[in-house]
């Protein structure tokens, strides 16, 4: 049976399309993907992303443990702020892309992908058990995925909405910085973050989930429903719209962001395979802090020394056509790779995509061809984002 978020019943009643995604039954759109997409680029929309995974790491050894199981330097950001970091397997392949918040008092919260939290829970606990063979750890790992509600408010008008709701200016926060706030007595964490390329904020708080896998922990989501409706009501003057996962995907693709399972992945195998993706291949080495030990580091160093045969590149269509995952990519008649994500940009009105290609072609300005329905269609590689960052995005010119 598919998993469900706290206010699934509201989505089922109000969304035009609800279907399974990564094991969760989720709203795909309410009005249309294009309508919700443009609401984020030009105004504001709210997403229920309570299907994302959350873990709490607590104890004197929490920081050292997280430094070992993730790639970035978790020790730098002060409380309360987050770090974008990766979890790798021993072969250097990406198990997931995560966000880790330093909550203070030896406590950290990790946010991970919806289809990764179960395997990460098993992974972290296995590592913890292995370390404890050499001595006890002061560390508790708690999976809060089914308990935590998470709403993402995105778009240029999100700043105004945050001022109205919480009396804070999110532009005073750096990216991934967070604050503890209240809404009608409901305490929550607010972070300046998102997955759309636009300015925005996300709120986290615990509530009962009527679809919790443990029957004894089920209950009515009074807080989640109240917060959701309150944000929608407060955002009416800004034209707020509820948005589904369809728009979330087209928005992240326009921004040039990777998606686990498409651009980053690991095989559930015990042998190296080219279908596994490392941070070096996915252009995610900005999330690696090399001056520490972490799982997968040795494999990455070897790969860096050997050379990287293929890398991610972004491209836009010149000819008419919509690229899709798995479509073949050519240059000068030579097969050089395949598409990992593709769509028709609701903002630009053209086909855009991301592909894995031979490294020599992974740079802007290269003319390529994408095989669409058996026919080669012209395209050109570009640097992300696909939109003009002076007109759109979190750092657009006012």
From Swiss-Prot:
Q: Which gene encodes it?
A: gcvT
* Catalytic reaction equation(s): N(6)-[(R)-S(8)-aminomethyldihydrolipoyl]-L-lysyl-[protein] + (6S)-5,6,7,8-tetrahydrofolate = N(6)-[(R)-dihydrolipoyl]-L-lysyl-[protein] + (6R)-5,10-methylene-5,6,7,8-tetrahydrofolate + NH4(+)
Please tell me one Gene Ontology term that the record gives under cellular component.
Answer: glycine cleavage complex
Q: What is its EC number?
A: 2.1.2.10
Kindly state which keywords UniProt assigns to this record, in alphabetical order. Answer: Aminotransferase, Transferase
Q: Its Gene Ontology molecular function terms?
A: aminomethyltransferase activity; transaminase activity
Entry-linked Gene3D superfamilies: Aminomethyltransferase beta-barrel domains, Aminomethyltransferase fragment, Probable tRNA modification gtpase trme, domain 1
Self-association and partners: The glycine cleavage system is composed of four proteins: P, T, L and H.
Q: What class of enzyme is it?
A: transferase
- SUPFAM superfamilies, alphabetically? Aminomethyltransferase beta-barrel domain, Folate-binding domain
> Which chain positions lie within coiled-coil regions?
none
PANTHER family the UniProt entry points to: AMINOMETHYLTRANSFERASE, AMINOMETHYLTRANSFERASE, MITOCHONDRIAL
Pfam families assigned: GCV_T, GCV_T_C
Protein name listed in UniProt: Probable aminomethyltransferase
Native source organism of the sequence: Thermococcus onnurineus (strain NA1)
An annotated GO BP: glycine decarboxylation via glycine cleavage system
Q: What does this protein do?
A: The glycine cleavage system catalyzes the degradation of glycine.
Concerning its family, UniProt says:
Belongs to the GcvT family.
Q: Which InterPro entries match?
A: GCS_T, GCS_T_bac, GCST_C, GCV_T_N, GcvT/YgfZ/DmdA, GcvT/YgfZ_C, TrmE/GcvT_dom1
